[in-house]
Amino acid sequence: MLRVVLDTNLFVSSILVTVGLPAQALDAWRRQKYLMIISPALIVEVRHTLAYPRIRRKYAITDEKVDQLVSLLEQRAIVVPGAADVTGAIPADPKDEIILACAVDGQANLIVSGDQHLLALGAYQGIPILPVREFLEQLAAS
């Protein structure tokens, strides 16, 4: 089964817009179509991003909804340390390196992202980086 790291922006988008492609990617994981790899740093980033007051107001995000997502991730995803040294891999946006570290530590087959800095890499240490649409097409074809 595919081992996949989803970028934080996809988690956030799937909560904010429940009918889009990011929501479909998360739903495919819930239906056990692939294994999700995640690190504690990515979980913290998801929680932190969903705590922004402007997001909370605009999308009526509650602590309960965030807690449910985090709990699901902690219980069903494969949690890896995300401590691989990937320093300098994304000079334009080093904070995105936590996604690469997670993928390397978790021996991921694929990284899925909407982030242009990550997508521009194309792959990292042999791990392809795809936009969500391509990922869903690949998943449907398998």
Model-derived features with residue positions:
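A secondary-structure boundary/capping signal
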Residues: 6-8, 38-39, 114-115, 131-132
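Residues at secondary-structure transition points
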Residues: 20, 37, 64, 90, ...
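Active-site neighborhoods of divalent-metal-dependent phosphate/nucleic-acid chemistry enzymes
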Residues: 74-110
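Acidic, PIN/NYN-like endoribonuclease modules and their adjacent C-terminal/linker elements
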Residues: 104-112, 116-142
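PIN-domain endoribonuclease scaffold, especially VapC-family toxins
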Residues: 28-85
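Internal alpha/beta domain cores that form substrate/cofactor-binding pockets in large enzymes
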Residues: 62-64, 71, 81-83, 87-92, ...
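Residues that scaffold the ATP/ADP-binding catalytic core of kinase and kinase-like folds
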Residues: 14-15, 49, 58, 121, ...
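Short, well-structured N-terminal submotif of metal-dependent ribonuclease cores
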Residues: 1-38
